[in-house]
């Protein structure tokens, strides 16, 4: 056992003495030690109940002959951090989480790992840390929140509230209506109810084979969720000492490609691109961003879930057959021979899964589009690529317009709220990339204001920052190189004409090579003055979005 390093032989008497202080007895030292990585946090709706959820898992581990050791990691609620400088800390928190998992598991030489994430950066952070440790690992997330219900029975979610703010500003709704939406949108525990970043990543855990069936879709705090937790706990005990189930044997290049096929088919959050690039690097099978369009070109988009289709949420996906039904529908594009934590291949796992509601999950022959719900655009405005959630486009997939430039998210929010943005504009928000922010803020506030003000089909937005999974509209993020590295987005001027063609994967500004060269000569950027010591460290080490915004020493 890996844990013998801390518990076997006379020389480890001091170590055992410390472990006995936690309640261990003689027989416990013969059992596998299981790390239970929790992310309980009282301020996060997707996490405030995870202390009780973890207890279910630990009790089941004990019943099955192993010793659980729970430890916690931090978590940032992106919705609460949204629209102010708290969002600077969201993406950097992914690295803290990865480092924390690696530190706890390697310092204490635990034999296996069960991870309990739920929201946004916590899921990829735990995956990245687990890949560094490389022991048998299972992911069991807290589960999605149920959709809220409005006065007329319409489905609501967090994005409904953000868009309602924009509607209130232009007097489409009154203060009471705004308050009613606020009070109804998030009815209880769980990760926000649409195919936003958290639920996108939780479903991709199923596609990669590191989580059990239903991980991404069974609602939080339900009997079925608790049953899934117990099943995951039993399984980690079964595989704890089996090297075949080390996480790097599960997450390989095939698993990463499987995840991206599923992501394209269901129109997941654009943040998944950032995280899967980072995860693939940690797994030793680095995905090139250019490969993603090849996957997109062959993958039909068969499921639209909020925000792309506001009335459909994760509970509807589960009732329609879940992620297995989506995978079975696109099985010809998957590596069906890849191993999963259950011991089955992916093909064995999804065999016989049926679509139960074709309004939620379409058949391939009735796909929303023949290409995937995410796309990478290239051109003189993004030589290293940029990302769009094509599934969330409200108007045309082809757009040309005049740039209106803002040098921060705060400037953009002020400009949009002040009525500066008009139909036909391309809103440019720059110096918000991984280095420029630093921290690559999400832009849900400005995009929601645009949609809420009725401009979603008539305005495009591009940024070197990123978007919430709740964003919809013609919104292009992760522009690389970013403005802070002298990228073209930092050289744009108000009035420049920008051409966007999603179906041809292109984004360009109408400037000659000579004009671009001249602007590059004139470019000066001294960098933002960052007060935070942690964010200064992050700014120094982080790479750009085309590399997954990973840290490189």
Curated annotation (Swiss-Prot):
Subunit annotation: Homodimer.
Pfam families hit by this protein: ILV_EDD_C (PF24877), ILVD_EDD_N (PF00920)
Binding site residues for Mg(2+): 78, 120-121, 442
Descriptive protein name: Dihydroxy-acid dehydratase
PROSITE patterns in the cross-refs: ILVD_EDD_1 (PS00886), ILVD_EDD_2 (PS00887)
Superkingdom, taxonomy of origin: Bacteria
Family membership noted in the UniProt record: Belongs to the IlvD/Edd family.
NCBIfam families: ilvD (TIGR00110), PRK00911.1 (NF002068)
Organism for this UniProt entry: Campylobacter hominis (strain ATCC BAA-381 / DSM 21671 / CCUG 45161 / LMG 19568 / NCTC 13146 / CH001A)
GO molecular function annotations of the record: 2 iron, 2 sulfur cluster binding; dihydroxy-acid dehydratase activity; magnesium ion binding
UniProt modified residues of type N6-carboxylysine: 121
One GO BP: L-valine biosynthetic process
Catalytic activity: (2R)-2,3-dihydroxy-3-methylbutanoate = 3-methyl-2-oxobutanoate + H2O; (2R,3R)-2,3-dihydroxy-3-methylpentanoate = (S)-3-methyl-2-oxopentanoate + H2O
The protein's annotated pathway: Amino-acid biosynthesis; L-isoleucine biosynthesis; L-isoleucine from 2-oxobutanoate: step 3/4; Amino-acid biosynthesis; L-valine biosynthesis; L-valine from pyruvate: step 3/4
